[in-house]
């Protein structure tokens, strides 16, 4: 979920990590277990390894009908990292249904006149569609981003051109007021906010609110490094202070990139050896609605549509003065779970007298939930949280979304004292959950009419998503369906696994407080899963 990068990307450090093989630790094959006592001994032995012994572990393993197979500290609270997404995505699937869609609109105060002139602002209105990107849908595990980053926005510009718009006498406005302007969750690290995994949350989202920066060495030592943006409009949005230089071929790269919170200046510094491949980074967009307006304005002008005004953003500042920890506990009555055959559409309100010049409908909800869980997409989970608050609470805010999730967890049988979330993605280090809450939720999901759809959103061991390089050998390959979670000193895995005898187990393994250099923790987690199923090894 979270990159190892801090405020400054030290590419030399990344290279050093890959060369030294810090992730190459291997466990011995797990001893075959035949009963609860043997399983407890096997897991306890795994947790006595030096890296694991220094950390704090919470484990819950149960059958689908709730019988306890193994537990360790399962009633204690842990930081879940991206395992928090399980709470957000199950709630969204149950309440919205798999077929729900979201509409983005381009509106104006009136239709174009006979000459194709629109008098007044043209407004791009977002309603929380996270699929406005170059991402491939449905998720296929290989070609995640084959399309141009702004292809969805280009389609809206094409629609205006087909409609005969020739001139806009006003501004191009990016409107994200469907949600209050709360771009970040509580406790998010300031050094995360410039990267893709910490992108700001907006009801008007394009390309996951991310642009791509390529940094290339010059021809000779001493030459300036060169930069290129994708999409090109990012070069108009961000300014670059570039002091990076080309170093001698074969020398160690030492390249840094930095953007201060709230700033639109990107600083590039350090060295990149001659002949070195380009370095590619995904940078968060500071203000997605403003960026979308700027990109849309340029697209219209590229199609011969004159625009007299500027590209501006329209936000709605939060007016909530209540204490979050109190507000989120207010009771809420939810509707019944959505029938899987039903389909609802979420659309922004249309002001009186306004006309829709163009519109775009998102992919079905299930397709986006799959991306959210498979690749652990933070922004998409945060948008889901706000959509839940908007539709089933009183506003598209963090606290209202959290109220909806909390109310749904009561329905799922999760004890209210067993979890507390400050966001929808798990990026907040302040989030807390017990392992037993995880397995309770997963058992509930397995009992619902949408259980197969939900399981299909999870990474599959050895096959796809964040588990593509774990559980790569039989019998666990293709038999582990689980959500990963990673933050500083946090590692987690929760989901389903099939035993040798065909029985499905539900598990949650939460590890907190390990040392940053403890690269073997995921291997320990995988070995615990293997022990629970009686598998000989995980690879």
Descriptions of predicted regions:
Residues 69-71, 160, 374-378, 382-539:
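Small-residue-rich helix-loop
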Residues 23-50, 94-416, 500-501, 523-527, ...:
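Conserved serine DD-peptidase/penicillin-binding transpeptidase domain
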Residues 1-9:
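Bacterial N-terminal signal peptides that target proteins for export
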Residues 66, 85-92, 172, 204, ...:
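Residue-level preference for non-acidic, small/hydrophobic
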Residues 73-78, 282, 425-428:
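A short glycine/serine-rich beta->alpha loop
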Residues 71-91:
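Short active-site loop at a secondary-structure junction
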Residues 48-72, 312:
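A short, well-structured edge-of-sheet supersecondary motif
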Residues 8-18:
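Bacterial N-terminal signal peptides
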């Amino acid at each position: 979920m979270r990159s190892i990068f801090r405020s400054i990307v030290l590419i030399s450090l990344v290279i050093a990590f890959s060369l030294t093989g810090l992730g190459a630790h291997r466990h011995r094959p797990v001893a075959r277990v035949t009963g609860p006592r043997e399983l407890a001994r096997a897991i306890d032995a795994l947790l006595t390894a030096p890296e694991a012994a220094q950390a704090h572990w919470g484990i819950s393993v149960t059958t689908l009908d709730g019988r306890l197979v193994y537990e360790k500290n399962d009633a204690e609270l842990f930081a879940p990292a991206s395992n928090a997404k399980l709470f957000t995505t199950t709630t969204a699937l149950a309440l919205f249904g798999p077929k729900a869609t979201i509409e983005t609109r381009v509106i104006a105060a009136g239709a174009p006149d006979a000459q194709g002139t629109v008098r007044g602002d043209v407004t791009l209105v977002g309603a929380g569609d996270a699929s406005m990107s170059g991402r491939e849908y449905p998720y296929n595990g290989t070609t995640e981003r084959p399309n141009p980053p702004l292809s969805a926005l280009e389609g809206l510009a094409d629609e205006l051109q087909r409609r005969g718009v020739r001139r806009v006498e006003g501004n191009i406005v990016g409107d994200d007021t469907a949600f209050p302007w709360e771009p970040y969750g509580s406790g998010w690290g300031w050094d995360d906010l410039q990267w893709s995994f910490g992108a700001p949350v907006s009801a008007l989202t394009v390309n996951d609110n991310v642009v791509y920066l390529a940094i290339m060495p010059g021809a000779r030592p001493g030459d300036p490094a060169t930069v290129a943006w994708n999409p090109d409009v990012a070069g108009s949005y961000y300014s670059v202070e570039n002091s990076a230089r080309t170093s001698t071929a074969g020398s160690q790269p030492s390249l840094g990139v930095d953007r201060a919170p709230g700033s639109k200046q990107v600083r590039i510094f350090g060295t990149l050896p001659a002949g070195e491949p380009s370095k590619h980074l995904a940078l968060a967009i500071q203000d997605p609605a403003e960026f979308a307006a700027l990109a849309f304005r340029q697209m219209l002008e590229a199609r011969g549509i004159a625009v007299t005004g500027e590209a501006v953003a329209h936000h709605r500042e939060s007016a909530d003065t209540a204490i979050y920890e109190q507000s989120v506990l207010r009771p809420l009555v939810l509707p019944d779970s959505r029938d899987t055959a039903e389909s609802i559409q979420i659309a922004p309100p249309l002001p009186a007298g306004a006309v829709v010049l163009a519109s775009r409908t998102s992919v079905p909800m299930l397709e986006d939930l799959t991306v959210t869980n498979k690749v652990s997409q933070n922004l998409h989970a945060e948008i889901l949280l706000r959509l839940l608050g908007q539709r089933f609470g009183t506003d598209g805010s963090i606290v209202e979304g959290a109220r909806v999730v909390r109310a749904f967890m009561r329905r799922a049988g999760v004890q209210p004292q067993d979890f507390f979330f400050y966001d929808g993605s798990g990026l907040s280090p302040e989030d807390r959950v017990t392992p037993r809450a995880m397995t309770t939720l997963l058992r509930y999901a397995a009992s619902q009419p949408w259980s197969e759809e939900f399981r299909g959103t999870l990474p599959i061991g050895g096959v796809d998503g964040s588990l593509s390089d774990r559980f790569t050998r039989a019998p666990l390959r293709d038999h582990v369906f689980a959500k990963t979670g990673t933050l500083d000193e946090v590692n987690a895995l929760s989901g389903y696994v099939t035993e040798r005898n065909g029985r499905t187990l539900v598990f949650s393994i939460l590890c907190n407080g390990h040392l940053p250099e403890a690269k073997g923790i995921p291997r320990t987690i995988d070995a615990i899963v293997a022990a629970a199923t009686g598998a000989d090894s995980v690879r």
